[in-house]
């Protein structure tokens, strides 16, 4: 019997705000333990929560970016449980009236090759709700220490429908969702800092069956790669249990990304175990059209939309768009460069950024914002090549020095004597005549309509010119002489 996997993901995203969800104490990471706290965070008697409007703005933006329905009214609920990471013994969350409903995350599955676009599909969402984060437990040899710095930080929970059917789809979903949150300025989504955390609910069922199988929740998925690997492992584990005639038990399992194994933690709790009820200290939130319209004006173009536009507007190939669009700063850098160099030079600009700029940045380990090469540098380099002032090989050398020094291409070319030498027109024409005379086959192919056959003559001409001839003049001269034959 053939089986299919059914996967739903619960993704927690820390919202990037200056202060916490229900108090004005600062939100942050990397501070000394328990220094980002106050009476509200520590749940001291008599304290009352006050909503953070910036966090509400952020979740509305997330909902708009993902095509959710923004509820006109949402409310706050208390999720009751006892654990040391929650001083109140409950978490303020949203239960039956979340702020965002529906929506979808567009994903791209791997193509047949790295330079081939894969299938696109949309993974539907159930909801997005806002809550407060909890503290962090640090387990030592004999003690467990509690750090409440994270407690109270605004946290979005993004819940997908059980519509993911493979580990690769889950990987693509998280990659796309993370990029959306970063593009929107909603979160930095640094998994090492706990800014993006994911739990996976996984079950298997016979192909064609509509009823869901018994689900297992997988936790401790500390990277997007671990999510993919953990899901693949859990699918194999469940299939092995079924093949042995066993029964899948509803439980929570801990995945160890280092060993590629998982172990049972506990039986899965049901929602009613938390005894949700409305928080009496917080009023419902009313989201009117004016509020949504204001947030809509701040929503950026998302990666896949930008990828489609780059192809339509600039005719960029997938090999370039698949790199450029996933970093908003990089795609903005590209468009700023194209604005200076000209839209007709977009592919050339893209090649310099993807192949040369990213290589130098990776080698130097500096962020793009700190790179000395700015859009104007690359635009000037492209114009110098196009004018025949410098040749491509020289431009490669110039780029490396330009990255190291921040000097303009023209200054470097003058300083190092890398400008193309002026070529005597009579001498160039003779070199072209000699190349044409020596290759009758290429002449016949060119005359028969094979335009690329002209390249067979360029090598001998450049060799005769010792690499200093202007490629544009070489091409023009060859075409003129061939047309006259």
From Swiss-Prot:
The keyword DNA repair does not apply. Its EC number is 6.3.5.-. Keywords: ATP-binding, Ligase, Nucleotide-binding, Protein biosynthesis. One of its GO terms (biological process) is glutaminyl-tRNAGln biosynthesis via transamidation. GO terms for molecular function: asparaginyl-tRNA synthase (glutamine-hydrolyzing) activity; ATP binding; glutaminyl-tRNA synthase (glutamine-hydrolyzing) activity. SMART domains: GatB_Yqey (SM00845). It holds the Pfam family GatB_Yqey. PROSITE patterns: GATB (PS01234). InterPro entries: Asn/Gln-tRNA_amidoTrfase_suB/E, Asn/Gln-tRNA_Trfase_suB/E_cat, Asn/Gln_amidotransferase, Asn/Gln_tRNA_amidoTrase-B-like, GatB, GatB_C_1, GatB_Yqey_C_2, Gln-tRNA_amidoTrfase_suB_CS. It catalyses: L-glutamyl-tRNA(Gln) + L-glutamine + ATP + H2O = L-glutaminyl-tRNA(Gln) + L-glutamate + ADP + phosphate + H(+); L-aspartyl-tRNA(Asn) + L-glutamine + ATP + H2O = L-asparaginyl-tRNA(Asn) + L-glutamate + ADP + phosphate + 2 H(+). It is an enzyme of class 6 (ligase). Allows the formation of correctly charged Asn-tRNA(Asn) or Gln-tRNA(Gln) through the transamidation of misacylated Asp-tRNA(Asn) or Glu-tRNA(Gln) in organisms which lack either or both of asparaginyl-tRNA or glutaminyl-tRNA synthetases. The reaction takes place in the presence of glutamine and ATP through an activated phospho-Asp-tRNA(Asn) or phospho-Glu-tRNA(Gln). Heterotrimer of A, B and C subunits. HAMAP family: GatB (MF_00121). Belongs to the GatB/GatE family. GatB subfamily. This is Aspartyl/glutamyl-tRNA(Asn/Gln) amidotransferase subunit B. It comes from Opitutus terrae (strain DSM 11246 / JCM 15787 / PB90-1). The lineage of its organism: Bacteria, Pseudomonadati, Verrucomicrobiota, Opitutia, Opitutales.
């Amino acid at each position: 019997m053939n089986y299919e996997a059914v996967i739903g993901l619960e993704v927690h995203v820390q919202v990037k705000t200056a202060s916490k969800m229900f108090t004005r104490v600062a939100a942050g990471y990397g501070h000394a333990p328990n220094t980002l706290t106050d009476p509200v965070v520590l749940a001291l008697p008599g304290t009352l929560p006050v909503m953070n409007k910036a966090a509400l703005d952020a979740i509305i933006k997330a909902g708009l970016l993902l095509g959710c329905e923004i509820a006109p009214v949402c409310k706050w609920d208390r999720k009751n449980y006892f654990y040391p990471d929650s001083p109140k013994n409950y978490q303020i969350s949203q239960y039956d009236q979340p702020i965002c409903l529906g929506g979808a995350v567009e994903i791209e599955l791997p193509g047949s090759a790295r330079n081939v676009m894969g299938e696109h599909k949309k993974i539907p969402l159930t909801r997005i709700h806002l809550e407060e984060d909890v503290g962090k437990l640090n387990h030592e040899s004999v003690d467990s220490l509690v750090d409440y710095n994270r407690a109270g930080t605004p946290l979005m929970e993004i819940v997908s429908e059980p519509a993911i059917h493979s580990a690769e789809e889950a990987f693509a979903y998280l990659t796309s969702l993370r990029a959306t949150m970063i593009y929107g300025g909603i979160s930095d989504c640094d998994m090492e800092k706990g800014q993006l955390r994911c739990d996976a609910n996984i079950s298997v069922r016979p192909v064609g069956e509509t009823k869901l199988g018994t689900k297992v929740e997988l936790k401790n998925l500390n990277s997007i790669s671990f999510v993919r690997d953990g899901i693949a492992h859990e699918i194999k584990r469940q299939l092995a249990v079924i093949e042995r005639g066993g029964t899948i038990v509803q439980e929570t399992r801990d995945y160890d990304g280092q060993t590629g194994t998982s172990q049972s933690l506990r039986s899965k709790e049901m929602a009613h175990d938390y005894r949700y009820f409305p928080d009496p200290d917080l009023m419902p939130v009313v989201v009117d059209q004016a509020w949504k319209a204001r947030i809509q004006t701040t929503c950026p173009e998302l990666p896949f939309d930008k990828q489609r536009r780059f192809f339509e507007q600039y005719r960029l190939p997938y090999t370039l768009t698949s790199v450029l669009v996933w970093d908003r700063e990089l795609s903005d850098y590209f468009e700023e460069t194209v604005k200076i160099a000209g839209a007709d030079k977009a592919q050339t600009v893209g090649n310099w950024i993807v192949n040369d700029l990213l290589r130098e940045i990776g080698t130097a380990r500096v962020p793009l914002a700190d790179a000395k090469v700015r859009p104007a540098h690359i635009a000037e380099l492209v114009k110098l090549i196009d004018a025949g002032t410098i040749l491509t090989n020289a431009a490669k050398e110039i780029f490396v020095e330009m990255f190291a020094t921040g000097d303009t291409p023209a200054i470097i070319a003058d300083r190092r004597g890398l400008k193309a030498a002026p070529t005597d027109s009579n001498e160039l024409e003779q070199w072209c005549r000699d190349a044409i005379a020596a290759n009758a086959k290429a002449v016949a192919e060119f005359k028969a309509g094979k335009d690329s056959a002209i390249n067979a003559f360029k090598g001998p001409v450049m060799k005769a010119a010792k690499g200093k001839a202007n490629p544009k003049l070489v091409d023009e001269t060859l075409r003129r002489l061939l047309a006259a034959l």
